[in-house]
């Protein structure tokens, strides 16, 4: 199975974004996965869509979490997306 596309949507000066990125990086490293970060302030459509929900976790394009990411839930989501 191919590696899931794990993306965290963030914006500048967002303390929840910093926390979410750490939780995501830690969980992804446990599974040997990569994640990417997208700054919504550089994309007006994303900024309009997600302005009130940042940070947002998307796995394979689907929104799976927002605001505070629960590490246990994230691990479960990554396990499911990885087919493990």
Q: How should these model regions be labeled?
A:
Residues 55-63:
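A short, hydrophobic beta-strand/beta-hairpin element that forms part of a small beta-sheet core
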Residues 62-84:
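Non-catalytic, surface beta->alpha helical segment in thiol-disulfide oxidoreductase systems
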Residues 21-38:
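Conserved helix-turn-beta segment immediately C-terminal to the redox Cys motif
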Residues 1, 30-32, 51:
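Short, well-ordered coil/turn elements that cap or connect secondary structure elements
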Residues 19-22, 49-52, 69:
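Generic recognition of short, well-ordered alpha-helical segments
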Residues 36-53:
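Thioredoxin-like thiol-disulfide oxidoreductase module
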Residues 2-26:
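Local sequence-structure signature of Cys/Sec-based thiol-disulfide redox active-site neighborhoods
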């Amino acid at each position: 199975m191919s590696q899931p596309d794990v993306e965290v949507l963030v914006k500048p000066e967002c303390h929840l974004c910093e926390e979410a990125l750490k939780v995501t990086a830690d969980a992804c490293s446990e599974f040997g996965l990569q994640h990417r970060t997208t700054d919504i302030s550089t994309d007006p459509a994303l900024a309009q869509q997600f302005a009130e929900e940042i940070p947002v976790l998307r796995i394979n394009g689907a929104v799976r979490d927002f605001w505070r990411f629960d590490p246990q839930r994230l691990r479960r989501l990554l396990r499911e997306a990885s087919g493990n």
